[in-house]
């Protein structure tokens, strides 16, 4: 095997392990967050005597449904592709990397990763905010608390929901900024690595050419002395 082929196989194995790690992380995250969303939908107890805003109930139902659908889609991709990658990675043969579908399914793996870690996490943050509003909004004022009765514009339930929203909204913005910064840093790192690998491949090719030329130069001399 030439140095160039050996370097290409090492690159393929590195991509295989990265794809496997992404699929494992996506499957664990999607299973956890979708399970939480389903439990929140089932266990939340709506007050039949309270008149909930129609928009709040529609937003909570839609957010929960989309959250579960997104994570189940990512989980389905991980479940379908991961066993094939695991079967190849457990074979102790360098040439078996060609049998792995990780390069052909690269877009699907990245889609599952994005759905699970970016879109799914943002929907989960929105789910927490809506759940706080649905849970705390029916709470009435405490007639025994004079401090609360003096402020007739807001109830304790509304105050709790507003507090959770005011905490979660800045955190969501920080999460978006961090996700964009992380993605740009990752793309920059991949670009640098690709340039480095191209330089290494060029050096390997030059070294292989030098060895071939040296072998061609030695062969006529050996034939002449023979």
Swiss-Prot record:
- Keywords assigned: Adaptive immunity, Calcium, Calcium channel, Calcium transport, Cell membrane, Glycoprotein, Immunity, Ion channel, Ion transport, Membrane, Transmembrane, Transmembrane helix, Transport
Q: Where in the cell is it found?
A: Cell membrane
Membrane topology per record = Multi-pass membrane protein
Q: Which domain of life is it from?
A: Eukaryota
Topology Extracellular: residue spans: 1-56, 132-159
Q: What are the BP-aspect GO terms?
A: adaptive immune response; positive regulation of calcium ion transport; store-operated calcium entry
One function term, GO molecular function aspect: store-operated calcium channel activity
**Listed Pfam families:** Orai-1 (PF07856)
Grouped into one coarse class, the protein's main location is membrane
Keyword Lipoprotein annotated:
no
Q: Which GO terms describe its cellular component?
A: membrane; plasma membrane
Q: Which residues are glycosylated?
A: 151
The keyword Calcium is assigned to this record: yes
Q: What does this protein do?
A: Ca(2+) release-activated Ca(2+) (CRAC) channel subunit which mediates Ca(2+) influx following depletion of intracellular Ca(2+) stores.
Which family is it part of? Belongs to the Orai family.
Q: What name is this protein filed under?
A: Calcium release-activated calcium channel protein 1
Q: Which organism is it from?
A: Gallus gallus (Chicken)
Q: Give the taxonomic lineage as stored in the record.
A: Eukaryota, Metazoa, Chordata, Craniata, Vertebrata
